[in-house]
Amino acid sequence: MKLFAAIDIGSYEVEMKIFQITSGKGIKEIDCVCHRMELGKDVYRDGKIGVEMTDELCRVLNDFVRIMKGYRVDDWRVCATSAVREAGNQLVFLDRVKRHTGLEVEVLSNASQRFMDYKSIASRENEFNRIIQKGTAIVDVGGGSIQISLFDKDRLVASQNMKIGNLRLRERMMNEGVSLKHYETLLTEVVKNEFLSYKKLYLKDRVISNLIVVGDHIGDAVHKNVMTRSDFLNFYDDMIYRSDEDAAGRCEVPEDVISVLRPSLVVYRCFLEAADVENIWMPGLHLTDGMAYEYAQQNRLLKLGHDFDEDILAAARNAAKRYQCSKSHIKVCEDLAVGIFDKIKKSQGFDDRDRLLLRIAVILHGCGKFISLSNAGESAYHIIMAMDIIGLSEEEKEIVANVVKYNTVPLEGYDKIGSSRMTRENYLTIAKLTAILGVVNSLDRSHKQKTKEAKQILHENELVIQLYSDEDL
């Protein structure tokens, strides 16, 4: 049994949950403490977190530390999201927090944050696996942005981020002095404008039957976790023009919750109009639940019921399709690459994560040709770095992007391509994976899949690849 504390420094509240994790009984929440403070308000207005807000956070975190000591937790993790991620004084803020609390704060990339939210939903295995059998969208509304993840036949096929989070929208309306009478109309225009391109790109040929709502107070406001489309629209019409005080009394939630709930309702309403959603599921889970699930996963305290790596690969394949990459060429290259990787894994010090990164690089290695045939490598690098590959850290995404880039041009030295995210170890990983991709790509240079069978034989320090074909290679 392990006691684990998860702390989420969000845009409009700081939350700590204490979990009891056992291999037999799974994850059990035993305490939850939440403090309302709007870090995002400072950031989205001024571009940085103020000293007063930082000092208040330090006081709250020190209280959390005392609670953790009282429970004698075995481990803990502190994560910050978009407010800290976008703060211009991020480094100064993190240093001040560490010096005053002793806590090391991990600033999550958007993709890592949303993937953890996704894991929190997947922890409800029975409900989750049943729901995603039909077309499903997860709409994760945060203070700074929203993430929409689409599932088709129980696999994640696309995930996209838009900077229309509830706190950001609220601050925008307040700065423009919008009255409650015109609030919905103007906010709807802003959100619908963002959804217009999204619908054309991702919803054109998809039927979305279910909507899963994450990271918001709507479940607390409606006092249920499942709603039909008509139930939601009735709730929306009843709430949208009420004053904050009146709405708070109606929903039995604090008044300051209403100010961020109202923009969220507009986002959900606009998504319902863009997709033919039948049912809405509000599991009431937060980032802290995902942190506990990931901790249990990494420490092998739980048996996983969902293959998250396959979700990442499915999303990569969908992106490759969008950039008109050759599916048959990818299949041949991926099979060859995995065969080579498995043979040299031990001698090269690879791990399972490296295998996943190689497969993603193989799947996406042709995407740059969509932009430029003469400069495909550089184009592919920028495409991949701009992608929201949910489940990959920025560091891992940069590895994939560089492997694809240097598949077509000579690999430069570490002093030329090194960055703040790229360690020497990452550079060596790029070099090794690039070599594998270069070999397998050359074996199907014609894109005609002439190879019928391939065998890899490792003899001491030499890898021999035997190919069988009825045609000239």
Regions found by a protein language model. Name each.
Residues S23-E38, V43, K69-G70:
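Conserved ATP-binding subdomain of kinase catalytic cores across diverse folds
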